[in-house]
Curated annotation (Swiss-Prot):
This is Virion infectivity factor. One of its GO terms (biological process) is viral life cycle. The gene is vif. Counteracts the innate antiviral activity of APOBEC3G. Forms a complex with host APOBEC3G thus preventing the entry of this lethally hypermutating enzyme into progeny virions. Functions as an adapter molecule, recruiting APOBEC3G to the ubiquitin-proteasome machinery. Targets APOBEC3G for degradation through the assembly with elongin BC complex, CUL5 and RBX1. Binds viral RNA and affects the stability of viral nucleoprotein core. May play a role in viral morphology. Highly phosphorylated on serine and threonine residues. It comes from Human immunodeficiency virus type 2 subtype B (isolate EHO) (HIV-2). Residues 170-181 have a biased composition (Basic residues). It is found in: Host cytoplasm; Host cell membrane; Virion. Belongs to the primate lentivirus group Vif protein family. Pfam families: Vif. Residues 154-168 are annotated as: Multimerization. Keywords: AIDS, Host cell membrane, Host cytoplasm, Host membrane, Host-virus interaction, Membrane, Phosphoprotein, Ubl conjugation, Ubl conjugation pathway, Virion.
């Protein structure tokens, strides 16, 4: 008697293209800037028996938890979708795990990676002093109700005063965002661009949905 085939269904997020940009950005932040030095990057040839997995990126979080981004390829081959790619976002701690959405994954990552405003910045802003810290992961605050202090610091950081337009800091951070994506897309081919210039005020991370190109 032929054994019945068992299926395992997991939630995934469809992406429109391959994952080279994601892999390049992770390797850049892990090996070049050291922002993700503790992150484990597992390429497809080291994954093992899971042939449909093209990569695994494991982010250690606080209190022994982890966030894992698994990249899938060759999905649903029985329908001919041989070029389909997707990612799965999983949070787990010990024996418990659950799948999360990109916005939740961003908030989990921001709790352990990429700098944000410190507690002393509000007092510095009130005294008219220069803001010394910046939020390098603004997409992690999407969907949250921001505090008045956070909104005030964002206004100071981005230079929105209603008359002078964009400040130098805001323009620089927009350049940093574009530069980070461009460096990932180019696979860090040019050593001068990727090693001789450092990202101002820490490394800016645009968020999982933007880097991966997750389709809604």
């Amino acid at each position: 008697m032929e054994e019945e085939k068992n299926w395992i269904a997991v939630p995934t997020w469809r992406i429109p293209c391959r994952l080279e940009r994601w892999h390049s950005l992770i390797k850049y932040l892990k090996y070049r800037t050291k922002d993700l030095q503790q992150v484990s990057y597992v390429p497809h040839h080291k994954v093992g028996w899971a042939w449909w997995t093209c990569s695994r990126v494991i982010f250690p979080l606080k209190e022994g938890a982890h966030l894992e981004v698994q990249g899938y390829w060759n999905l649903t081959p029985e329908r001919g979708f041989l070029s389909s790619y997707a990612v799965r976002l999983t949070w787990y701690e010990r024996s418990f795990y659950t799948d999360v959405t990109p916005d939740v994954a961003d908030r989990l990552l921001h709790g352990s990676y990429f700098s944000s405003f410190t507690a002393n910045e509000v007092r510095r802003a009130i005294r008219g002093e220069k803001i010394l810290s910046h939020c390098n992961y603004p997409s992690a605050h999407t969907g949250q109700v921001p505090s008045l202090q956070f909104l005030a610091l964002r206004v100071v950081q981005e230079g929105k005063d209603g008359s002078q337009g964009e400040s130098t800091t805001r323009k620089q951070r927009r350049r940093n965002s574009r530069r980070g994506i461009r460096m990932a897309r180019d696979n860090i081919r040019t050593s001068q661009q990727s090693s001789s210039q450092s990202l101002a005020q820490g490394t800016y991370f645009p968020g999982l949905a933007e880097v991966l190109g997750i389709l809604a």
